[in-house]
Amino acid sequence: MARVKRGVTSHAKHKKVFEAAKGFYGRRKNTIRAAKSAVERSMQYAYRDRKVKKRNFRALWIQRINAGVRALDLDLTYSRFIDGLGKAGIEVDRKVLSDIAIHEPDAFKALVEKAKAALA
């Protein structure tokens, strides 16, 4: 039986790790031990932050909606506005609401009025 040398497979594995470590600083980009742990950690951060990104955007949309609502009516808060929209039967998600608040103030004002009417 022929002797199997592992050079080709290990070189391919190392090459894959170094490609992922491209742009890293110092030893982390050109020694396999440092690069492997750095790449593993970077993948953990990437996985975690894909989840965190969703939370951050939702928080941003809520802040924008709240600012838009309070600019139109000082007595109305974000939570009461959302409650009013629900009671009025208007189903618009927060992403669209924040976009409307920024780009179409007249339409947003109409939504605020409908929400206030539903609360009264």
UniProtKB/Swiss-Prot annotation:
UniProt GO molecular function: rRNA binding; structural constituent of ribosome
Record-annotated membrane-spanning stretches: none
SUPFAM superfamilies: Ribosomal protein L20 (SSF74731)
InterPro entries given in the database record: Ribosomal_bL20 (IPR005813), RIBOSOMAL_L20_CS (IPR049946), Ribosomal_protein_bL20_C (IPR035566)
Keyword Ribonucleoprotein appears in the UniProt entry: yes
GO biological process assignments: ribosomal large subunit assembly; translation
CDD domains per record: Ribosomal_L20 (cd07026)
A matching Pfam family: Ribosomal_L20
GO cellular component labels: ribonucleoprotein complex; ribosome
Keyword tags: Ribonucleoprotein, Ribosomal protein, RNA-binding, rRNA-binding
Family in the record: Belongs to the bacterial ribosomal protein bL20 family.
Its biological purpose: Binds directly to 23S ribosomal RNA and is necessary for the in vitro assembly process of the 50S ribosomal subunit. It is not involved in the protein synthesizing functions of that subunit.
Identification of the protein by name: Large ribosomal subunit protein bL20
Species whose genome carries this gene: Xanthobacter autotrophicus (strain ATCC BAA-1158 / Py2)
